[in-house]
């Protein structure tokens, strides 16, 4: 009887070791990356940053520029310097005005004290999922639109 109990314990330990080995081999093969929900979260973060910059421009009665950097995949607030950093597996593109207020515009979305903006669209994508963050040039309003490619 005593020998049988020890043998059962040895079987359980062996099975657990095999399961752990299989998990170590299989788990890295499961694709990890930005989910649809997290991609939408990034879109919401960027929209909130843009809305904050618009509000700051109205509040301080001075233009505020939100800076987009495609190389580092960042969106930086012109009001408080906060940054939304996108991971490398997220596609990041923007459609921006070439001229605004009679002057050339770089990689920024400018907001004016009147609430107006130069407008633009920021596009986030991963595989067949995408979101557009659109800034209306006339009202400065910000909206998020699903842009799935399925």
Language-model features and meaning:
Residues 2-3, 13, 21, 25-59, ...:
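N-terminal helix-rich module
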